[in-house]
Amino acid sequence: MNPVAPTRKVKPPRNRPSDRRQARKKARIKTKGIYLRAIKDAFVKLNPKSAIKNPVMFVVWVATLVTLAVTINPDLFGPNQQKNPQLFNGLLTGILFFTVWFANFAEAVAEGRGKAQADTLRSTKSEAIAKQLSPDGTIAEVPSTNLKQGDTVYVVAGDIIPADGEVIMGVASVDESAITGESAPVLKESGSDVASSVTGGTRIISDELIVRVTSDPGKGFIDRMIALVEGAERSKTPNEVALTVLLAVLSLVFLFVIATLPAFAYYADTPVNVPTLIALLVALIPTTIGGLLSAIGIAGMDRVAQFNVIATSGRAVEVCGDINTLVLDKTGTITLGNRLAEEFIPINGYSVEQLASVAWAASVFDDTPEGKSIVRLAEKLGIRYDLDPNLAQAVEFSAKTRMSGTNLPGGREARKGAVGAIQGFVRSRNGQTIPELDAAYERVSQQGGTPLAVCLDNEIYGVIYLKDIVKSGIRERFDQLRRMGVRTIMLTGDNHITASVIAQEAGVDDFIAEATPEDKISVIQREQAQGKLVAMTGDGTNDAPALAQANVGVAMNTGTQAAKEAANMVDLDSDPTKLIDIVSIGKQLLITRGALTTFSIANDIAKYFAIIPVIFAAANLQSLNIMNLTSTNSAVLSALIYNALIIPALIPLALKGVQFRPLTANQLLQRNILIYGLGGVIAPFIAIKLIDILITLVGLA
């Protein structure tokens, strides 16, 4: 291939105060746009095809048409003895119309947030010109939409990466803020399972890369995310479907009750007209939760999206609320990751300098953070192995051998790795291990570090102490999960002693030491066999089977394509700890739905006492008029006005969610019954009475 001239480095722009003010202004404009679009969409949703999807609100929709007909012709269902029936029926029609419209508005606002996110993602796509590399090394400029899987492209500083792909040559900094919102550039390089993955629409800000395209047009990561976000409102979760069926059954029961009332009213010599019966029906059916149910589900996905996580469906978010077990990798989730060499511990009569020299040789080709830290620590001591890298051969780490190193000139072998693996290697070369190694191993392990043994041929020189730090506050977060009934299991490749020390410090419930990728699937299957729901995170190709097996699998955006496709959530920030937040959001979704359902049903009690006593006042039920409402008209209008206004009043709560507290199921139930059950009874009594007073003052009673 023709040589490419080096490019100058481009500094990423800094966030100035004016930039932040502009960002806040854009956020306000975006919110205003969401509400303006929702107002329009709420009218569009009045069409019968949309209305019938919500059985409860469809009843109100039909009731609105009936009262409209009665407003036009008050004697439609027989002679009407009511004073000024057209005014009353007209007011009734208007209130019912706005009840349906407010429910549509709540759903449209929730959907609008998803559409806004889809628009943001869509804006990252560009019709850029790509520099396509042909097999003979020549560069041809083609539209990015013409690229297909398997093509190779060349990108330099300032270019937009034209399609999803894998880096096959080069090292560069990439700005992924258009997707993740994180301004810090991300290093991309070839030869890494994770850092070699790039996303179309991101921008390269320094150096250059050669990328192999991994997706066809319209099937890239951003395309899939747009499809997921825009399709969020169309798929109901199983719990949402079950609750919808329950609300529909309750509505049918109340419809049957209302249908039988005229006969009882005739027997009691207290005739009831059709508009009043319709008002009673609407007041009794659970319109509050019926109007907010879709918004709650869609908002759950939106709250996850605000954490920069894309869920494949509402079901994935909801399942998070029922999670019993979290399977977590130690490195990067529980600890800070990037273990660094802290100390050389020589044994067997060797000096620190001799151990550092062999460790340097075993790590000179190791590009991992751990390997580079070993080289740095040795060079800090002024130690290097006398080695010509051109005459040496790298030995890559593998999960099977659990060690890596260098084949040196003259047939010598420098290795570093797990203590057990190095012991086996030395024995296979007719060497011997000594008790001093076990003492060094235990010393490092008891400090929560990772011991790496170092050998040259059949002689063990000592142990490298790799230091890892448990993230601050992680123990408190695990305590919160435990109070919610969620069990945590830590997986680590460390030995049993190190794993035990870190598990105790972090406060996890269980751990698996010296874990392999197969252990992830085994522990998930074991937990699922006990009837538990399991969540886990992963980023590598070897994590894909476990991500697919888990009930909730969260793939890192920096992970491989296989991991993203196997998971049902993708974290754009690639932060494994976010799984804990996602579980909390799932539980908040379920709690919000339960709380508003409780509030809605409790509301019916107050509305019952508002309307029934005044309708059947002649049947000696006036004593039940404990609110002392002025008249039948004022009672009906007051109850229905409250019934309509409570829906927009609760939209912020439905979108934001009920405040989440890490409590047990019984404690949550008691709290919700007290706040939303008792509150759902008391609030309507007060509100309906105040509305009745206002109606009386304006002369509509």
Curated annotation (Swiss-Prot):
Residues binding Mg(2+), per UniProt: D539, D543
Catalytic activity of the protein: K(+)(out) + ATP + H2O = K(+)(in) + ADP + phosphate + H(+)
Keyword Transferase on entry: no
InterPro entries, A to Z: ATPase_P-typ_cyto_dom_N, ATPase_P-typ_P_site, ATPase_P-typ_TM_dom_sf, ATPase_P-typ_transduc_dom_A_sf, HAD-like_sf, HAD_sf, P-type_ATPase_bsu_IA, P_typ_ATPase
EC numbers for this chain: 7.2.2.6
Main localisation: membrane
PROSITE patterns in the record: ATPASE_E1_E2 (PS00154)
Subunit structure comment from the entry: The system is composed of three essential subunits: KdpA, KdpB and KdpC.
Protein name (database record): Potassium-transporting ATPase ATP-binding subunit 1
Organism: Nostoc sp. (strain PCC 7120 / SAG 25.82 / UTEX 2576)
Gene: kdpB1
